Amino acid sequence: MPETFAYYEKIEKEHDNVKVVYWEAGFNYSTINNFGFKFAKGDYIMLLNNDVELITPDIFQSMLGLCMRPEVGIVGAKLLYNDHTVQHAGVLVGAGGLADHVFKGIHEDDPGYMGRAISSQDVSAVTAACLLVKRSVYEEVGGLEDEFQVAFNDVDFCLKVRKAGYLIVYDADVKLFHYESKSRGMEDTTERFIRFGNEMMLLNSKWDILSTFVDPYYNPNLSYLEYYKINHTIKEARKKQLIARGEYSAPKK
């Protein structure tokens, strides 16, 4: 986007501590962020899309306060659509096929299930549209995987960080608008659908999400199709087990 690059030039001229580097090759979200990381000098690295707009003024102070904890590797934020409904409040791994944002579509002030939409907490993954990570952790896990060009690079990255022993935190106090896919457009071409499907298969083959992965921050009695609602399939299966063992008692009316 021309206005994006014009803004980059403007802030680089106005601030001595701002350095803009340019990626000349084709789009690969992972490779581009790994490229930028090589030029960054701080102990904490912020991945921030150019299609977000800050709402919370002290975004860095809040996220840094969490990320400085020794057990934390990554901190993500609450992202909103421009109508002030939720676009991202943490990622549920195993939902939406492989992974999905929870609480999508509720109002930004809606507490959600058990207040989880408005409470900072540990999660399995957060979106990289706004993600703060320790430099040491980024280096330890080898950054983002280049094979995830567009989709699931953040989920894979977070799972790598969790596997390395660090927590992923959703900071409910930090809010931004997220105007999704402003630079690239939406996934609406045959080529992009194929690429998306390939990246889905890659994520599953790496983490075995469809077979064995269990999100530790989600109750297994709840549905992965209708988030935070009782999974009646599990409920009925449990009932049949109890009946077979002669241990079932019908609920009193």
Residue ranges and their predicted role:
Residues 52-96:
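Conserved donor NDP-sugar-binding/catalytic core segment of glycosyltransferases
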